[in-house]
Amino acid sequence: MQENSTEIYDDKNRRLKPLMWVAMVSMVMLFGGLTSGYIVTKADNFWVNFDLPDMFMVSTLLIILSSVTISMAVKAAKASEYGRVKVAVLLTFVLGLGFVGSQYMGWTQLVDEGHFFVGSLTDIKGEYGVDYTIAYNGESLLYNGKDFYMPQDDEFKDPIDPKMFGSFNTSSSFLYVLTGVHIAHLGGGLLAMLVVLINALRMKYNSEDSVGLEICATYWHFLDGLWVYLYLFLMFIE
């Protein structure tokens, strides 16, 4: 019986884990392309620099904590501790929902500050130099309270406003795309986590078979690491 269970476990590993790794490699390529595009676009034309929403820090803490709880679930399953598996998976699912909620609150803050998915430079609210700055071809612009000027034009003789007319706030668009695509993939992770939660409540994970839980945990850790990368990238690139 033990040998048969081991064979089933190994068979599931062979069938499911390669699919998971293919999905994760594809995501690495996708986000690598998006962040590369971010860097290239930032150095060209107008670019708005602003602080990330405070709720994104909350998102980071929640998803890191969820990685801890899903690891606890896997450890509990290896020991056939059904009760701990249920609690740990449930906590992970709740923390995942909290992450989504905090992201939504972060987007709400962006909208309140005039940073829209498709918006112009004139939509931005706040004090220039404190809440945001604008760069042109990599150079931060000067602002005299009325018009914008290139940094070398310290006597404010040649305003650059005509070039700014009709320009989009590309930086906020990139922010929505990066976080939105991550949320979309995390949504898939939450659906998988829901299936795992149902199985955990039915006490299906134990020392002999926890493949589904392990695969979900690996994918969840990946999403965690991906978000931390995006958060640090966005925080320091700004």
Question: Predicted regions span which residues?
Answer:
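...captures the hydrophobic TM-helix bundle architecture rather than a specific catalytic motif
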Residues: 1-238
